[in-house]
Regions:
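Positively charged, solvent-exposed patches that mediate nucleic-acid binding
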Residues: 1-85
Length: 85
């Protein structure tokens, strides 16, 4: 996964998800997007507010389970300094 962040002027965070056709067919791409969206939803209160985030899924995300996707997302957020422990 790759994460890009940008400050917004709102009190809430926004999440954008991009999964290329190179990752797999539509079933695989939508599964990855659903896992990312759900892991963000469940951890949203721990993120600092006022950020736009775009997560780009790479080939390595194919076949991963929920806990792998969630840990990768939280790791990226911690690297950017937008996640409270």
């Amino acid at each position: 996964l790759v994460m890009y962040i940008h400050r917004n002027s709102m009190e809430k965070n926004r999440l954008g998800i991009s999964v290329s056709k190179k990752v797999g067919n539509s079933v695989v791409r939508h599964r990855i997007a659903r896992l990312l969206r759900e892991s963000f939803r469940l951890n949203d209160e721990k993120f600092h507010s006022g950020w736009d985030m775009v997560v780009v899924a790479r080939m390595g995300a194919k076949g991963k389970n929920y806990s792998d996707i969630e840990s990768a997302l939280l790791h990226l957020a911690k690297l950017h300094g937008i996640y409270e422990k």
